[in-house]
Amino acid sequence: MKKLILISALFFSSNGLTVDEDLMQKNNDEIRPQKFKITTTWITMSDGVRLAADLYWPKDVIDDKKFPILLEYLPYRKDESRARNYALYSYFLENGYIVARVDIRGTGNSEGITVPHEYSDIELDDGEEVIEWLSKQDWSTGKIGMFGISWGGFNSIQMAMRNPPALKAFISVMATDYLYQEDVHYMDGIMVAGDSWMMRHDLDNSIPGAPEFKMDDEWIEKRFDVKPSVFTYMRQQRDGAFWDRASAKGQYHKIKIPGYHIGGWYDGYRNSLLRMLENVEAPVKAMIGPWDHYFPHNAWPEPQVEWRYEAVRWFDHWLKEINTGILEEPKFAVFVRNYHPPDSSLKEIDGFWRWEDDWPIKRIENHIWHAHSDHSLAKNPGTEDRHHLEYRASSGVEGGGPTMWWGSIPPDQKPMDELSLVYDSEVLDTPFEILGRPVARLRVSATAKRANWVVRISDIAPDGQVTQVAAAAFNGTHRNSARNPDDIIPGEEFNLNIDLHFTSWVFQKGHRIRVAVNNAIWPMLWPTPFPMETKILIGGDHGLKVEFP
């Protein structure tokens, strides 16, 4: 299995900063787990509730030696995930860090009533107390770093918004700063069908802590007899204060702590990297590779990256005051994707790494492609026309609808395209590279009061296979505001500007570009319940067009 280490030896090219490929191939097999000590402890909160913690210790612990501490703070039952934790943390232990793994209140072995939902005030209040406690122990240097993937990436960002004095740096992996539009509940402002992840999480939280799994009256009261958080989310169907509270979006000025953000092209949380790079004034770095929802060192698809090498350099700079040179290097490592077939069993994605000094990249230019009445896609607008589409609420299954969040590798898009309005370019005579968030501009109408629109960009290979490159959905009732949605007036035309999700792709010579539009992506997102027909303006100044960055 290929494992790559990011190296600081870079050289410039006309397309940005590129790494020496020979150095990128350094194998990390010499880093092997060793025997490290694990101890358990309680961390008492100000209200008397105790949180359960595991401490993973470096080998060279002596009585008077102090270490910086890395915190992973999760609701995922630490006692039953020690195999995962030991393998993950060993790299940090070998490099002179203690790692603390703490169960959130009311989860795993921690005491208290289960937190009411993700990233609640009580979770984050407790997090501040945990950081303070870790910083004051005799074996602590007083400098804490925080890291995590998914939930642990989210609350790392949120703790950075609170700026506890001992927290010196964080790393957020596969997480987002925009809870309403990009978490697993209302992707693109539309309810995720079933929210199955949240229901499974509620069930996990109801289980007593290991190893006793004690089922008594206290367990009934504090774990089992608690309202499932999925009901809380079902009542928060519009953007607003509930989501703002723990979203960095719109509150970037609160983050004073240096952050390193890692995303994946096949993960649903990748948009946040761009916003953090562009808006946070504290030091920021970012990396995005060809990965689904995994840490990059054991990710699928490959190539994998030993991200912990970068993490140690990052934390060494901020927690040990070692000049690792990491701040003198480019801010943004990007894996540029070449074509691959629409095969969900692919083990490796073809492409290459590029290092960029900043975001947005100044040399990027937008290229506008217009839909034409003959269903072609061209660089010039055509004559005005209107195309009609009969609504099918079940549409989406054919194109990989079960993928929860515009992640993973969807199957061939041809079956879904047959139920959509599609617009194809001529065969490309030169490669065409995009990097960023394409924007689809539409003028539409519907015969019902509620409708969604889905826009997909795909690559048509010479053999006819259609690979999805970028996509997004839009809730038509949010055309003016996601905070104050209003029904569509049947038959009335209005404009939509849809930001597709962050993507990178090189359309190869001999391939074609496809833009497809329809009104559902089931069973990823809940469809609207009304039979209808939708129309889209083609051609002229306001017809369907897509801006490719």
How would you label these PLM feature ranges?
Residues 25-65, 424, 428-430:
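N-terminal cap/lid segment of alpha/beta-hydrolase-fold proteins
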